[in-house]
Design a protein with these regions (language model features):
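Domain-terminus/edge residues, biased toward the C-terminal soluble/receptor-binding domains
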Residues: 228-232, 238-358
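Active-site-adjacent loops and short helices of periplasmic peptidoglycan-processing enzymes
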Residues: 70, 75-81, 85-248, 252-261, ...
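Ubiquitous "structural anchor" signal
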Residues: 41-44, 154, 311
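N-terminal secretory targeting signals
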Residues: 2-114, 349-358
Length: 358
């Protein structure tokens, strides 16, 4: 089959050799224009004649597609599956790591960059590591929140409803306390201390007489009153890295909170069941040492945000001594309790070395 360009070249070549000498330049342009039009019509006609075959082929190709569409329409809809929700992982280094506190060594090779162990009765310091460093304290904050609630002697049976204001926008942390859930103040206090429930702690501060801002102001005033000179609070949960303190100050906080029987009981319980509507929720302690028979814990609180690392404070009895333990900025999920175990074995070993075995 000849191409359009080849036919045109042959045609104009013929005109140039036979006709143009006779008819002149004017007739030459007329002949060129008429010839181009005629050949274009011929080629277009041949292309048009071939089009039905293409349409037929296209129609034939569309039949399976149409059939497949009908089959899909008649098929039963498949159940939709939701993609699993992935927790937001924060990989930022802790303030202590950035400050180089982990480079400081200690005799027990602790994973915590800050540690302080004090005899509760004599105030003797048994172990100290970066105890004046001011760092974020995460949910250790909730001890101060709980202390204010008990100080105010608010009715523990008063019902409090979780609202949108209690939802964490700082870290996007999850909670099983849905907006609209109503629980007694005492139950919210229990969940805040034992299970470190953030919405519970925020609701306690939000519903305090005067509101949240008044509550936070009182947190700072209370800290000052009991001698916490390195401490600052900006909210009641510990989700903000601006809630900061030192190990020395936290020893004071633990000693003060330990005087409250309710805080001792709630912080050291291993589980609690709350009724929410037509179902129940089971909450468990965040401190794995609570159920360990080797430990006698009188008060405790755990904490974690990326800026603070793993944190743990406790009042406990080891080898007959009442001790206050503070561990901040521990690296690794289980490292804070592992550090506590190292200290316990160390204290017991020192006790055995001093007291003759009978």
């Amino acid at each position: 089959m000849f191409s359009k360009s080849l036919i045109l070249r042959n045609y104009f070549s013929l005109l140039d050799s036979k006709l143009l000498d006779l008819w002149g330049s004017a007739l030459k342009q007329f002949a060129r224009g008429w010839g181009t039009l005629w050949l274009s019509m011929c080629l277009a006609g041949s292309a048009f004649a071939a089009e039905p075959a293409k349409s037929t082929a296209t129609a034939a190709a569309k039949k399976p597609v149409a059939q497949a569409q009908r089959n899909t329409a008649n098929a039963k809809p498949k159940a939709k599956t939701k993609a699993p929700v992935k927790a937001r992982v924060d990989t930022r280094p802790s303030f202590g790591k950035v400050a180089g506190l982990h480079d400081v060594s200690d005799e027990l090779s602790l994973k915590s960059s800050v540690a302080l162990v004090v005899d509760q009765d004599t105030q003797e310091v048994l172990l100290s590591k970066n105890d004046s460093a001011v760092l974020p304290i995460a949910s250790i904050t909730k001890l101060m929140t709980a202390l204010l609630i008990t100080d105010a002697q608010l009715p523990m049976d008063e019902m409090i409803t979780i609202t949108q204001d209690d939802v964490d926008t700082e870290k996007g942390s999850r909670s099983r306390l849905q907006v609209g859930t109503s629980l007694a103040r005492g139950e919210l206090l229990h969940l805040a201390l034992m299970a470190s429930e953030n919405r519970a702690a925020h609701a306690l501060g939000r519903t305090y007489p005067g509101g949240l801002q008044v509550f936070v102001g009182l947190m700072n005033l209370k800290a000052k009153d009991i001698g916490m000179t390195d401490t600052r609070f900006v909210e009641p949960t510990g989700l903000s890295s601006k809630n900061q303190s030192s190990a020395k100050d936290l020893v004071t906080l633990v000693q003060t909170a330990h005087r409250e029987p309710l805080l001792r009981d709630l912080s050291t319980s291993d589980s609690h069941v709350v009724d929410v509507g037509r179902h129940s929720l089971i909450y468990k302690t965040t401190n794995r040492l609570i159920n360990n028979p080797s430990w006698d814990i009188g008060l405790q609180k755990t904490g974690y945000i990326s800026e603070a690392g793993q944190c743990l404070v406790m009042q406990t009895k080891i080898a007959g001594r009442k001790l206050i333990m503070v561990f901040l900025d521990s690296a690794g999920k289980l490292s804070r309790t592992a550090d506590a175990e190292r200290v316990r074995r160390w204290v017991e070993a020192k006790h055995r070395a001093v007291v003759p075995q009978t």
